[in-house]
Amino acid sequence: MIKVTGLVKKFGANEVLKGIDLTIDKSEVVVIMGPSGSGKSTLLRCLNFLEEPTEGLIQVGEYKVNAGGKIDRHRKKVIRELRKKTGFVFQSFNLFPHKTAIENIMEGPIAIHGKSPEEAKAIAIELLAKVGLADRADHYPAQLSGGQQQRVAIARSLALDPLVMLFDEPTSALDPELVREVLLVIKSLAEEGMTLVIVTHEMNFAKEVADRVVFMDEGLIIEQGTSKQIFENPKEDRTKQFLSKVEAIVAN
């Protein structure tokens, strides 16, 4: 489903990703965790070329792109197709403020997949029901809570029928009482067998849904394993240090 080989990302002299190798299978739920500045979000953004990698190979489904390749029409087309297969949900909701919830979701199927307004509306209605917002179809973002806006953002990404969903700390901008409603939607996607890659600090959620946990630090994958292995019996000292700090913060 996803294969990353030798992925390097530099911002000037700063090497943020230092040769990442990662394979994610179809229907697998992978949680990426680590301290701030470890390269988690950059890795996620490289997976669908929101960030152009410096070196390495990225494959999503049948679409394979080498980093640093010649920017020609064929490469642009492959990247465009790869992006269609990867839904991306950001920390901030990035909804169009002048469009209603249903209009936000309709935008992608019409603009990218060439659907008719009627077809796009049917897709949007189904997805709003899926995320528990059927009664908010005609509300504008300003009329929705943060949790509701993020659920619309998830529905908008699902409207493009992606192979994989990428979540970049989807609850970090939410008030604590709104976090669970978003996590429940993500959990339902996992239960349906969708391939998910999630950057999150929600450790209990990771324990609950992750097939595999990847711990990153300083641009490297330090350790990976099942959620049980990582949370109950981490092998690397750096992983143990990180988890103990997170647990201390949660306890307080």
Predicted regions, residues:
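Catalytic Walker B motif of ABC-type/P-loop ATPase nucleotide-binding domains
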Residues: 165-168
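ABC ATPase "signature
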Residues: 224-225
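A short, proline-enriched helix->beta-strand linker immediately N-terminal to the Walker B motif
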Residues: 159-163
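Short coil-to-helix segment of the ABC ATPase nucleotide-binding domain corresponding to the Q-loop/switch region
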Residues: 99-107
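ABC ATPase NBD coupling module
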Residues: 65-87, 117, 233-234
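Conserved ABC ATPase signature
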Residues: 140-144, 148
